[in-house]
Amino acid sequence: TRLQGDWSSDVCSSDLVYKNEEITMPRAATFLKSTDRNERELIYQLIVNRREKDTVALDELFDLLRDLRHSVSLNAGYTNYRDYMFDALGRFDYSVSDCEDFHESIRTEILPITKGFMEERKERLQLDRLRPWDTEVDISGKPALKPFHGARELVDRSIRSMARVQPYFGECIRIMEQMGHLDLESKDGKAPGGYNYPLYEIGVPFIFMNAVDSQRDLVTMVHEGGHAVHSFLTRDLELTAFKGTPSEVAELASMSMELLSMDAWDEFYTNAEELKRARKDQLEKILSILPWIATVDKFQHWLYVNPKHSSAERAAAWMQIQDEFSTHTVDYSGYEHSRKSAWQKQLHIYEVPFYYIEYGMAQLGAIAIWRNYKKDPANAVKAYTEALKLGYTKSIPEIYETAGIRFNFSRGYVKELADFVKSELEKLND
């Protein structure tokens, strides 16, 4: 645990100096959205240079963690840490080969679509070459979306939009507000992040976040709202263990709410063009994250079934896997070294090994629920609600089946979901 925490210590202390001011890495990253390309390039250089200072230390830290984890797995009677962790994480409903199917399906069915996003970006920004500091700026050249002003508007508009999906969903947030269970606005000295915290004794959860009136905050609120609804729906289950669901199920609740609420985002945006921008941004993001999830997961499999690897072999394996899931649309000339150590920025590899693919599995499930909703809203919401009520009293595939979807990572099924999102994006582009 102490070694795992060393990653956070190194990364959290990695401030850099910009315009004579010391700023954190997360704050520095916000400048990558600047419409000034020279500023973006400068901040990217500063971030890369600062990360490079930690590369050797983080490499050595991982060597220690890998050796320790391998020893733990041998002592427990396993041949490698991957197999040990599959059992430790309670992955009884899917296997290593299912994860490999997920990797392959993302590579073949999702990657071509995300490549199209990057090619559109290059064209809209009118660039000869897309560089690594060009991937975050809004391609419309318009100011950042502002869906609300202050926590009061965020709460009211979230309640209205979620209630339009199902009145009970909005009522859950209303009860939390009345009980003082919402702490939403960013304040000086407030801890970072956002989460829904279940309170099993009373059955009414608590939402914490750091809202700054952004589109991302809207998504965070309905995401955590999905977790909150899940908490309400499982409050009467007999055992606490039934209420604590695995991430493959918990994130299905929250990621689905992001998409189910999207038709009601006109509660946040009265301007039709802004509403379209917000929806397009959401759909592109949910697909674009999937190749990165597959990259990180496949890399972790390699790390632990090859426990004697050297630092150089690790870097080579990372580059090979990264290339498998790359759109090859960004020109990294002069910054190849930053790609070689990019895995070091992923907290999960250091602190919660093998925990990451669950987000990808749940995202595919959420897309399937949304597809059902677009065909038959009433029945889709009913099935979603019934699935959440189960808590963890059924297996993951049974919960997905109750929701009217499949726990499936085959190329054919993933292609169906990808084509559906693509068709919805095309409607927004009309």
Predicted feature descriptions by range:
Residues 1-11:
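Single conserved hydrophobic/aromatic residue that forms the stacking wall/gate
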Residues 20-34, 41-42, 63-208, 279, ...:
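Active-site-proximal, well-structured secondary-structure segments within enzyme catalytic domains
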Residues 42-56:
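Switch/coupling subdomain of P-loop NTPase systems
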Residues 108-109, 245-274, 281-284, 288, ...:
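Post-HExxH zinc-binding segment in Zn-dependent metallohydrolases
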Residues 206-210, 237-247, 276-285, 303-304:
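Short beta-alpha connecting loops at secondary-structure transitions
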Residues 213-224:
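Short alpha-helical catalytic segment bearing the HExxH-like zincin motif
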Residues 221, 229, 256-259, 267, ...:
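C-terminal, non-catalytic "cap/extension" segments appended to globular domains
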Residues 226-240, 260:
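Catalytic Zn2+-binding segment of zinc metalloproteases
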